[in-house]
């Protein structure tokens, strides 16, 4: 089994967007396969070096005349992982499905209104793509969030389109519904599972042809974890508002002390 999975690469690809139960699915897949599952949280918790790899992957795909995903980069990113779900991988499910022809796709689904409410309070605030002051950008870069935010925004634009108005709830809801429909239409039915995590183990294990584990299906709420990240950004924003006036005051004080006194 282990040797076969190593040769196959990714066995499961998640096409469901963030806040659809992907964190619970990650843990479920890790319980089933006894190997790690790639997820957005892997990047900001463990794999910071992957940010540059994902940006390079997206750039190469955009510029590729045949729209093929870079095989070598994918193998570097997913080395040691049995599955890849959530952002940023979900945005490339079509390309990954072609790269790993024996893989299967799990589309985690959720009520659109509930999904949007969850996004607004965590990963997709209305001002996610709005310009920030240089002081805010500087502070965010100092703590390592600048590139992570840039990658996530690039990923969201690949999902929803370059013209998406992230501040508009109706546009976001339509984008979410359209994304799910595109997945359903483009993935062969025998390789696709539409999965609500409230369904538990049975449909997932049946689809993957694996025995049901002797433990409850994991139901993890990543709300608190994501809120901590958002609150950190909010603190940076507040601090950045004081940075420029403080810097100007310091410069004037220095000039006054140096040349006037």
Regions found by a protein language model. Give the residues of each.
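PAPS-dependent sulfotransferase catalytic core
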Residues: 1-72
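Short His-Asn-centered micro-motif
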Residues: 14-16, 40-41, 85-89, 109-110, ...
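Short, well-ordered alpha-helical microsegments
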Residues: 22, 90-94, 116, 201-204
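PAPS-dependent sulfotransferase catalytic domain
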Residues: 34, 42, 63-78, 88-91, 94-194, 210
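The conserved 3'-phosphoadenosine-5'-phosphosulfate
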Residues: 46-50, 106-116, 178-237
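Glycine-rich phosphate-binding loop used to anchor ATP phosphates in small-molecule kinases
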Residues: 75-100, 107-108
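Terminal signal-anchor or tail-anchor transmembrane helices
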Residues: 235-261
